[in-house]
Regions:
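DUTPase catalytic domain/fold
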Residues: 1-190
Length: 190
């Protein structure tokens, strides 16, 4: 299912997710790129549409490296996936990453999107990283993103959610009052 390049560490395992770790190198890119229906590794050695290399240079993260504000980096992650056909995954930044104003998204081979990993995916994971407010220092093993695994359809209808709230309240007026918020007072539409 998850094939780490280095053994897992206990701190990676969260109640509902797994922290993904930065690999040994990062690529400084000219710009972000939309994943295409090809292997990401093949994009790292070819000319882009403007006939220039997509990769400006490669950085070693094993001793730590500075990622400059406003620049785009692509980092191969230590984890690889071999998902069964019935399991997909979603990735998102850790809350600490957001508080540091670092934009991140997971990229996979043969996928035209970000952060959504299709059922049955087998291959490497990459993280696009863009520090927005200031430079950051990262090293191999640091975690900026997390992954959650999904089987089946995990959505619930508005009606079902309202019925659940009636029998087992989900929202309360405030922390000091155990009185549930009437479902008419909250919106469940997207």
């Amino acid at each position: 299912l998850i094939l780490p390049e280095y053994p897992f560490v206990e701190s990676q395992i969260q109640p509902a997710s797994l922290d993904l770790r930065l690999g040994r190198k990062a690529y400084r890119l000219i710009s972000s790129f939309l994943p295409e229906l090809s292997a990401i590794s093949s994009r790292l050695n070819v000319l882009d549409f403007y006939q220039s290399d997509l990769v400006m240079y490669e950085m070693d993260l094993t001793q730590g490296a500075i990622l400059e504000k406003g620049h785009v980096y692509l980092v191969p992650l230590l984890e690889h996936l071999e998902l069964p056909a019935t399991l997909r995954a979603r990735a998102n930044p850790k809350s600490t990453t957001g508080r540091l104003d670092v934009f991140t998204r997971v990229v996979t081979d043969l996928n035209a999107g970000f952060d959504e990993i299709r059922a049955g995916y087998k291959g490497p994971l990459y993280l696009e990283v863009v520090p927005r407010s200031f430079a950051i220092k990262v090293r191999t093993g640091d975690s900026l993103n997390q992954i959650r695994f999904v089987r089946g359809d995990a959505t619930v209808s508005d009606t079902a959610l309202q019925k659940l709230h009636e029998t087992d309240p989900l929202l309360f007026r405030n922390a000091s009052s155990p009185k549930p918020l009437p479902h008419k007072e909250f919106r469940t539409e997207r």
